């Protein structure tokens, strides 16, 4: 089940210089089998059935509404038979709100020379034990049906920006996009055959070529998926290329369907994505950066292992209400990082995820109040100020 309602759109406004500040931003509500999600939303990534270093209770406390699971990695470990014992991911990982699972396409793509792609699917060696495996659109749908995720992603080929220094040509991007399009249809047929009660999203591909993006979009819209994603961005391309595709594609998707930008990105990317008409985001950046002492704040990024923080009594971000900032100093966080204590990345992950989720809450509030343009100006000024 999926119901999506656009509650409000960004009104056209002008700044003091008379510059147009209107955007494609919209405020929505997404109803899924395991709950209601307010959009725009950031979705923490739980690759192996867990958001790294963060308990489900902590995610609930920071108002996470939906998280991700990774079809490929959960297939590898613990294996489908184990998850099936629990009736799906929700009970297995004790998360009772919505879950989105990706199809495994990106992970198979990232195996590089260890995999072989054909019309039928992808042959590859298991990164766990070396077993020869075969993943097809049909098998991906079967796995995700067993996982019982609220949102199921089609199996696709992630078009790379470059391969060993060779930038993907338009012809190569077209072949990849057309394969993903054919796989989308096979996913749709298998999904319906399985009578999966959840929602299947199509994924727009096409590399950095706007004409291919449009062709992919048109074909997927004709299939009438409940929702759509923009894939194949943040895969090594220059930032300006990613922003160009973001500006081109999301707002052209059906206005009455949810739009998901996959694997993006920085706080600035999220705000830019909202302005481009995106409703849903995911990225490993908050937790991955946290494990490396890189923390996001309202006033720019903070690298906690820097010696300047050795004796600072202030919290990571004095404007933040997360558990970390309410209880611990920069000096303590610096100490944990320097000692390699596991509590360090746990507290840093709590902070970074809270920052991302709160940023989206502020975006929703600005859209509700009809002041998104004003919010964007203040957000940019604050982030550029520096800690």
From Swiss-Prot:
Which terms in the Gene Ontology molecular function aspect does this entry carry? metal ion binding; tRNA-guanosine(34) queuine transglycosylase activity
InterPro entries under this entry? ArchSynthase1/Queuine_TRR (IPR050076), TGT (IPR004803), TGT-like_sf (IPR036511), tRNA_ribo_trans-like (IPR002616)
Task: Give the record's pathway.
Answer: tRNA modification; tRNA-queuosine biosynthesis
* Enzyme Commission number(s): 2.4.2.29
Assigned GO CC terms: cytosol
| Cofactor info, note text | Binds 1 zinc ion per subunit.
Q: Keywords, A to Z?
A: Glycosyltransferase, Metal-binding, Queuosine biosynthesis, Transferase, tRNA processing, Zinc
**A Pfam family it matches:** TGT
> Can you cite a GO biological process for this protein?
tRNA wobble guanine modification
The lineage's top-level taxon is Bacteria
* Class of the enzyme per the UniProt entry, highest EC level: transferase
Q: Which reaction is the catalytic activity of this chain?
A: 7-aminomethyl-7-carbaguanine + guanosine(34) in tRNA = 7-aminomethyl-7-carbaguanosine(34) in tRNA + guanine
Signal peptide limits: none
Binding sites annotated in the UniProt record for Zn(2+): 320, 322, 325, 351
What is this protein's record name?
Queuine tRNA-ribosyltransferase
